């Protein structure tokens, strides 16, 4: 036998368990599934130790060797997964209906409206309090502008239990599912998406979540779906179109109650790729003001998104009472 050659195939070698590409390897199984920019924990070290660049030991599906307590940093054991065999504490965030899971690393989570169901392969965690078992779903800020804004410290998000939300640019329903968790069974999410391919996924999400009403239609023509959508408390928009402020304004005029709120995600590139992002954001804010939309807060989404900002404001604010 050659010196330095192990007959057992070198567990933990370059491609095997905990190696560089195998189980719990390079940020794949047990990492954040390539969760852009090294997953949740920032740049990460390419995921040795079962996805250190992920949520320290994985944040996506438990992968092989997961819940059995192995899986080198998978879900149940090894070096720190989402639960990692330790007690995790879930505490309420200052935004109502949103929670923080405190473990080895903190994560933003929402209370799962449909326990036992993942929507896009996100990690779930169950917390038992006496007889009551509550399941939470991890909310990845690299895949959701709202989560990025919350972790970026936005002052008000206006999406809370019991409210009605018109969500423009719903895509496959990843963020919509978390909004559905937040507003709960008393609230409603009207999810508008133009692409039929994404719309199919959105409809599948809505089948299990009774508070989501999918609308497969162009948000530029709100009159086409006015029979489906009632008055709402909040409009959220992530449409990435050059005329997106006009699109939001049209929908606000149709469906947003006076004194209601809007949350708009602006991608500078989509509006004017030649101008500086700050100039684009300022121009969009000006357009909003001309449409009876009063911006109250603006926030960039670094480090989760480049050249993105979220603008939060109020629609047709009630006139100030003169004393």
Curated annotation (Swiss-Prot):
Catalyzed reaction equations: L-glutaminyl-[histone H2A] + S-adenosyl-L-methionine = N(5)-methyl-L-glutaminyl-[histone H2A] + S-adenosyl-L-homocysteine + H(+); a ribonucleotide in rRNA + S-adenosyl-L-methionine = a 2'-O-methylribonucleotide in rRNA + S-adenosyl-L-homocysteine + H(+); a ribonucleotide in U6 snRNA + S-adenosyl-L-methionine = a 2'-O-methylribonucleotide in U6 snRNA + S-adenosyl-L-homocysteine + H(+)
Annotated binding of S-adenosyl-L-methionine, by residue: 174-175, 193-194, 218-219, 238-241
GO cellular component: box C/D methylation guide snoRNP complex; Cajal body; nucleolus; nucleus; small-subunit processome
Residues found modified as Asymmetric dimethylarginine: 8, 17, 23, 29
GO MF term set: histone H2AQ104 methyltransferase activity; RNA binding; rRNA methyltransferase activity; U6 snRNA 2'-O-ribose methyltransferase activity
Renumbered residue ranges of the record's region Helical: 276-308
GO aspect biological process, one term: rRNA methylation
SMART domains xref list: Fibrillarin
PTM info: By homology to other fibrillarins, some or all of the N-terminal domain arginines are modified to asymmetric dimethylarginine (DMA).
Biased composition (Gly residues): 7-44, 63-78
Keyword line: Methylation, Methyltransferase, Nucleus, Ribonucleoprotein, RNA-binding, rRNA processing, S-adenosyl-L-methionine, Transferase
EC code: 2.1.1.-
Leading EC class: transferase
Annotated region (Disordered), positions in chain: 1-78
Subcellular location field: Nucleus, Nucleolus; Nucleus, Nucleoplasm
Quaternary assembly: Component of box C/D small nucleolar ribonucleoprotein (snoRNP) particles. Part of the small subunit (SSU) processome, composed of more than 70 proteins and the RNA chaperone small nucleolar RNA (snoRNA) U3.
Function, as annotated: S-adenosyl-L-methionine-dependent methyltransferase that has the ability to methylate both RNAs and proteins. Involved in pre-rRNA processing by catalyzing the site-specific 2'-hydroxyl methylation of ribose moieties in pre-ribosomal RNA. Probably catalyzes 2'-O-methylation of U6 snRNAs in box C/D RNP complexes. U6 snRNA 2'-O-methylation is required for mRNA splicing fidelity. Also acts as a protein methyltransferase by mediating methylation of 'Gln-105' of histone H2A (H2AQ104me), a modification that impairs binding of the FACT complex and is specifically present at 35S ribosomal DNA locus.
Protein family (similarity comment): Belongs to the methyltransferase superfamily. Fibrillarin family.
Designated name of the protein: rRNA 2'-O-methyltransferase fibrillarin
Organism: Xenopus laevis
Source species taxonomy: Eukaryota, Metazoa, Chordata, Craniata, Vertebrata
């Amino acid at each position: 036998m050659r010196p330095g050659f192990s007959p057992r195939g070198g567990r933990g070698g370059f491609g095997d368990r905990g190696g560089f590409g195998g189980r719990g390897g390079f940020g794949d199984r047990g990492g954040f599934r390539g969760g852009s920019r090294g997953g949740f924990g920032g740049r990460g070290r390419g995921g040795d130790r079962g996805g250190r660049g992920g949520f320290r030991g994985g944040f996506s599906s438990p992968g092989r060797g997961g819940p059995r307590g192995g899986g080198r940093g998978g879900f149940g054991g090894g070096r720190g997964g989402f639960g990692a065999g330790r007690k995790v504490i879930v505490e309420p965030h200052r935004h109502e209906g949103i929670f923080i899971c405190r473990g080895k690393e903190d994560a933003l989570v929402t209370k799962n409206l449909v326990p036992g169901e993942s929507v896009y392969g996100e990690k779930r965690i169950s917390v038992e309090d006496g007889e009551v078992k509550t399941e939470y779903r991890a909310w990845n800020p690299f895949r959701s502008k709202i989560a990025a804004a919350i972790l970026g410290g936005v002052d008000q998000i206006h999406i809370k239990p019991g409210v009605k939300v018109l969500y423009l640019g719903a895509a496959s329903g990843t963020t919509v599912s978390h909004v559905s968790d937040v507003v709960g069974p008393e609230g409603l999410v009207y999810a508008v998406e133009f692409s039929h391919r994404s719309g199919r996924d959105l409809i599948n999400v809505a089948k299990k979540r009774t508070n989501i009403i999918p609308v497969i239609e162009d948000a530029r023509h709100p009159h086409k779906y006015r029979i489906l959508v009632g008055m709402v408390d909040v409009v959220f928009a992530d449409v990435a179109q050059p005329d997106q402020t006009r699109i939001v304004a049209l929908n606000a005029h149709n469906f947003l109650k006076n004194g209601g709120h809007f949350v708009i995600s602006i991608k500078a590139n989509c509006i004017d790729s030649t101008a500086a992002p700050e100039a684009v954001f300022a121009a969009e804010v000006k357009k909003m003001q001309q449409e009876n939309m009063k911006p109250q807060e603006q926030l960039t989404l670094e480090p989760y998104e480049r050249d993105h900002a979220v603008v939060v404001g109020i629609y047709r604010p009630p006139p100030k009472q003169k004393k």
